Amino acid sequence: MQRRNFLKHTAMAGVMLPQFLNGYSVRAMAQSSLMPAIGHDIPNDRVLVLIQLVGGNDGLNTVIPVDQYGAYQAARPNIALPQTKILKLNGFDATALHPALSDIQQLFNDGKAGIVQSVSYPKPNFSHFRATDIWMTGSDSDKILNTGWAGRYLNDSFPGFPEKYPTQTMPDPLAIQIGSVIASAFQGPAFPMGLAISNPASFYDLVEDKTETTPNTRWGDQLAYLEKVSQKTDQYAGVIKKAAQSITRQSDKYPAPGKNPLADQLKIVARLVAGGLRTKVYLVSTGSFDTHAKQAEPDDTTTGNHAQLLRRVSEAVGAFMDDLKGLNAADRVMGMTFSEFGRRIKSNASGGTDHGAAAPIFYFGNGVKAGIIGTNPQLPTSATANDNIAMQHDFRSVYATVLQQWLNLPATDIQTVLMGQFPLLPMV
């Protein structure tokens, strides 16, 4: 294959230019003057998988407060789920799941998944763009950061990247995102700390040795130049391909390709993890959670747009976990969902919900402590359009927990990475 085709997108001096390697999309690492590597050793082979629910997921129809069902139903007369249809959770009679979440229910009841209730931050922002930026960078609501929380973690754990990498102890990309543009979560002090694979088709083009010709345009000239400063990124094409080609059989629980884009992304992640990549953090995403209208079907609220979105997540996570088990890689992986915000307590007249504050997140893996962290949100007896779910847990407590207790970031480094100290949660 033509290695020079590995780059499709690269950020250099703030400019994005197209590059070509079988459709791969990547932010290349420009030269910098970082301190040299100091013999850093990989603390463990654990992997964190982040699942972004883009648009603001409705937490109250995802995790239902059964103990307040009357208030829940009164606040949402046009979208409330029937109490006879919601999914029970072993040992937690006061809480249930949306009927579309059967795979996540099974993981929970098997002791391999948990819920953190009412996750948000002080003074929540209701803009999609700003709220997403807050979650990606790990900032306060009134502070702008130009680095991502995962980027700071990777920069702290792998000093000297990219100049001193790959190394014998870390020969692989530090982070991988399935998406055309690297997320701000992976932004380091000087450059992105990970690679972005544009889409599943691009991934399989690489694995199957499909090639493209360098275009005879001004972009081709820029390609030749950028290759010289992106040789380290180019090296990663080989290790990604080697890892992927070592896995020839995966779970049959995945939907057919194209039927569930999130499942397609997680299938790639499973293949790379099981193939031996030491990449620490993966990011995948699925969208359309901005359910202002027609969130549920009026004649059957267990169906409709939100149900389809949640089913997509549940089926993808279920297949992913089944795949990891079959590939003997499940013990290495912890996953979690997140969304930029939740929705209001009261549904609107359009059969939807408007931008809100706190919402639950799911976490899963063989090594997690299953259960529910926190209590059901307290619902008013007569909700108004302005009522929000109150925060119980700062989202940076979730980050601190997975960084310190799953990825083994020293407690002394949490302040540097998260710009503060946050209580740990019993997730691991």
Please report, for each region that a protein language model flagged, where it lies by residue.
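Acidic/histidine-rich, metal-coordinating catalytic segments
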Residues: 334-342
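Feature for exported/extracytoplasmic and membrane-associated proteins, marking the mature portion
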Residues: 1-315, 319-327, 346, 360-428
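C-terminal, helix-dominated tail/subdomain
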Residues: 350-361
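Alpha-helical scaffolds flanking conserved acidic
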Residues: 47, 332-333
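Basic/polar, cationic surfaces and motifs that engage anionic cell-wall
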Residues: 343-350
